[in-house]
Amino acid sequence: MAKEATRVRRRERKNIVSGVAHVNSTFNNTMITITDAQGNTISWSSAGMMGFKGSRKSTPYAAQMAAEDCARKAVEHGMRTLEVEVSGPGSGRESALRALQAAGFTVTSIRDVTPIPHNGCRPRKRRRV
């Protein structure tokens, strides 16, 4: 009996004009997620997804490449305007933001939503090199 050919499911094209870009930049990686106003994910990318391994993931260039990839996927869904929420202490924050602006998005607002403790958990010990 012949095996039935599996059908390739094509992702349906949503028509969303505005959304929110969540840029999470850690010391080791940069993750960018573009959502609609309700928080449903439209596209996402990270420096690790772009093929960067190890310490190269934490570079501004890797964050720029991830932002360009994420922006390209969001433009396919018809997105034009973005609010940007930046989180974390990493080095890829500004370069990811610049890459989103260069991709043709109109950035309406930039918010820093990095969580700041009011003397919460004890921080990790200082690194001595």
Curated annotation (Swiss-Prot):
One Pfam family matching this protein: Ribosomal_S11
GO terms for biological process, alphabetical: translation
Keyword set, alphabetical order: Ribonucleoprotein, Ribosomal protein, RNA-binding, rRNA-binding
Single GO cellular component term: ribonucleoprotein complex
InterPro entries: Ribosomal_uS11 (IPR001971), Ribosomal_uS11_bac-type (IPR019981), Ribosomal_uS11_CS (IPR018102), Ribosomal_uS11_sf (IPR036967)
GO molecular-function terms, A-Z: rRNA binding; structural constituent of ribosome
Family per record: Belongs to the universal ribosomal protein uS11 family.
HAMAP family linked to this entry: Ribosomal_uS11
Subunit structure: Part of the 30S ribosomal subunit. Interacts with proteins S7 and S18. Binds to IF-3.
Function: Located on the platform of the 30S subunit, it bridges several disparate RNA helices of the 16S rRNA. Forms part of the Shine-Dalgarno cleft in the 70S ribosome.
Protein name: Small ribosomal subunit protein uS11
Species annotation: Beijerinckia indica subsp. indica (strain ATCC 9039 / DSM 1715 / NCIMB 8712)
